[in-house]
Structures are given as structure tokens and as C-alpha cells.
Amino acid sequence: MEVGPLMSQNLSQVSATNEAAAAQEDPRRFKLIPFTEMTPDQKRYADAVLAGPTVASGSAAAVPGAATIGAPFNVYLRSPMLAERLRGVAEYIRFKTSLPQKLNEFAILVTARQWGAQYEWFAHHRLALKAGLNPAIAEQLANGQRPIGMDADETIIYNFSHELHTTHVVSDAAYKAVVDRFGEQGAVDLIAVNGYYVLVSMILNVDRSPLPGGAKPPLPPLK
């Protein structure tokens, strides 16, 4: 049957509508790659993630038996060699850092707030609270406020991280406070967790990674 101009136009509109609906349902720019469609290098990386400590943390992005892996790992798959190198860095920063877990997660939340990284905040908020961060401190931070009621260590971490993100340098006072409390290794590990999660924030924001289960974005816009 010959398709007339009007019908052709209608079909085009339907197609465009369907494409828009699909995009709305899955806003990811880097679409999920099922295990069955991964290259050998991608599969090796994905298997390594699933065999690592991320799974035990309860990450929704790394679930044994799932059809694929989620963000940011799904994005890293596009560059398997980079992905494998970042995996070692990420596992050190998450699980082997010299900083106490609560403070490490607090620094991640500071980074997520600065970058408006909804997925990153969603993933690490529960980990920070589980590690002992006061929910009121997290709530104030989410609202773009300097949290009231921080203990001495939290204040040191916040001051250093906030200065680093907002001014791109740190004052002598902020630096000295970190080194005096956590040593030079602690200072380097604190720089590293802030820096690595800037990368993660960039990955997630560029990808437009959706929150699991259609969760509401936890971070309000900053004024």
C-alpha cells in the first residue's frame, strides 16, 4: 500500500513520540550493556566489579545475577582499560583508605553536593548514615548549608573539602588541621576521595544516570 504524505507525516510523529517516551523512561546517554553483548574486555571488567567489595556494600549498580552493571560502571565499560585502572583506585578510596569510613563518606557527600550529583548522593547518603554520620548534618549539607553540630573531625573534613571544591586551593589552617589529625597520608587520601568523586560526579551527570526505583532526587537546587 502506498503511504500518502499525511500518513507519512503521522507515522513520523508517532515514531518521534515513541522515541521521546523511550528517552523519558531511560534518560541514560550511555545505555546499559547486557552481559551477553559485552566484549571480552568489558566482561572481564564487569566480572571483576562483581567479585570485588562493592557488592558487599549493597550497591544497586553491582548485583550478582543481574543482566548488567549500573552506573558509573556501565559508563566505564566504554573504555575497558581505563575502567580497570579506575577500579583499583576506587576500591582503595572506598575500602582501604586511611580515613575513617564515616569521614570518607562525608567527604563524598560534600563532593556530591558541590556537583549536584543526585545519583552519587543517593548511593552514598545511606552509607554515610550507616557509618555514623548524623542525619541532621547530611540534611543541612543537602540543602547547601554549612552543617551545624559537626564534631571536630567532621569540621576538619568539611573545611578542607569545601575549600578545595569552592576555591580550588586550601588555606594553611585547613591543611594543618588535616595533617595534624590524620597525617600526610590522610591528607593525600582526603584529596583523592574528593578528586575521584568529582570524576564520578561528572560521569553520572553527563550520563544522566537515573535513580534506582524512580526515587525522588534528594538534592534541591542551590540558590
Go through each PLM region and give its residues.
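Acidic/histidine-rich alpha-helical segments that form the ligand environment
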Residues: D151-I191
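A contiguous pocket-lining binding segment that forms or flanks enzyme active sites
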Residues: A131-F160
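Sec-dependent N-terminal signal peptides
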Residues: M1-P5
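N-terminal hydrophobic signal/anchor transmembrane helix of membrane proteins
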Residues: A83-R87, A107-A123, V188-N205
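Acidic, carboxylate-rich catalytic segments that either coordinate divalent cations
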Residues: V178-V179, G195, I203-K223
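Mid-length scaffold segments of soluble, non-membrane domains
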Residues: L99-Q140
